[in-house]
Each structure stands twice: as structure tokens, then as C-alpha cells.
Design a protein with these regions (language model features):
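Conserved alpha/beta-domain cores
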Residues: 2-154
Length: 154
């Protein structure tokens, strides 16, 4: 995975179940649009949000923005999020609340398996990592070493 990193200057969060935001997201001029499966989606609507992704991805990308999907942190939610999110039109997954490299490696294995199942190039899906607590700070270098890494927010 030696391809160049994306040049994302502006990223726009869009709740994947919000028709109002989906309808206009592609007109806002963002370099990347983040379809949110995490905080903007209540637990009862998580599955509906996953099912909405195949229609939402090309819709928000129609003016050339890259598409990123923010998945949930708990593994029981992250696994179905990955199954729904990894597809040719999704450039990256945003991984929230990362605490260490082990979690990132595990998610990378799941993404690799999903890409292979879909016949996609392994490594197509990049990672944007969100460091949201101090426990991860000693592990930043190891987290950043993940080959799928496109960016990190601390």
C-alpha cells in the first residue's frame, strides 16, 4: 500500500439516515463526506443505517467527493458496520475511540477479508483514526504504523 495519501482539506459529517443532509451533502464542496453510523444514529436505527449505505454512497459522491464511513467502536457493532461499509465507493473508514494498535490491526483483518470477499483490491479501504482519550497517547506511533492509515485526529 504505497499509494499517495488523500489530500482531504475539508470533511463533512452527514448522518446516513438524514434525508435533508444527504440531499445537499454533495453540493457543499467538501473533499470528503463522512457518512456517520456512530453518534448520529440511535441504537435502534443502526441496522437501518447500514442498509442505507449502498444508496447513500454514490449519492454523496456525485460531485467527486471521497466517501468515508464512521463506524462504531464496540466490536459487536464494528463488525456489521464493516460488512456494510466496505465497498468500492468507500475510500476510508473512520475508526472512533481507538485505544491501541491491537484494535486497529483486528479491524484491518476484518476489512481485508471483506475486500477479498467482494473482489476488491486488498488495501483499497483506508483508515482515519480518532484518538479520543489519553490512554492511546503512548501508542500513537504503533497506531500510525498501520498500512491502511490515511490520517489521525488526536
Amino acid at each position: 500500500m504505497t499509494r499517495p495519501l488523500p489530500a482531504w482539506r475539508s470533511l463533512l459529517f452527514v448522518p446516513v439516515l438524514s434525508e435533508r443532509f444527504l440531499a445537499k451533502a454533495h453540493t457543499r464542496g467538501a473533499d470528503a463526506i463522512i457518512l456517520d453510523l456512530e453518534d448520529s444514529i440511535i441504537p435502534a436505527n443502526k441496522e437501518a443505517a447500514r442498509k442505507a449505505l449502498p444508496a447513500a454512497v454514490p449519492r454523496v459522491a456525485q460531485n467527486g467527493a471521497d466517501v468515508v464511513v464512521r463506524i462504531n467502536r464496540p466490536l459487536e457493532l464494528a463488525v456489521p458496520d464493516i460488512a456494510a461499509s466496505v465497498m468500492p465507493g468507500v475510500a476510508a473508514l473512520m475508526l472512533p475511540k481507538v485505544m491501541g494498535p491491537e484494535h486497529v490491526r483486528l479491524l484491518a483483518e476484518l476489512v481485508t477479508a471483506r475486500e477479498a470477499t467482494l473482489g476488491m483490491a486488498v488495501g483499497h479501504t483506508r483508515f482515519l483514526v480518532l484518538i479520543e482519550g489519553p490512554a492511546a497517547l503512548p501508542h500513537l506511533y504503533a497506531i500510525a504504523a498501520e498500512p491502511r492509515m490515511a490520517g489521525m485526529s488526536v
